[in-house]
């Protein structure tokens, strides 16, 4: 039996007309950087209430930019979950920092906020929760811990 990891075809079919129209506009304009990308960035910034948004080609690039914006340096520590795509730890290590893994809550598969504080050291700069399977990590608890210890989430 073959079980697909994710059914991209079903997701595509749901928005096919909208996606195809946007792709056609980009191809017709021959503007592949800027144009629609700039429009997307403006819409994302407005939607999120941020001053700026930067579109990235991958989540890996987005993580790298976020860590660089936080001025993560060699020797810094970032708390995250071990139950994530490799890019989370990879980009931490790429900058010479250390991923510090906090175990998951076995009910949600997300990082267990009750275990975070025990892993915080003087070198800890941030907490990177990862929400999985349609369940958001306990952001209220994580943000409270981060605020208490002056960490970025």
Residue ranges and their predicted role:
Residues 1-29:
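N-terminal "arm"/small-domain region of PLP-dependent enzymes with the aminotransferase-like
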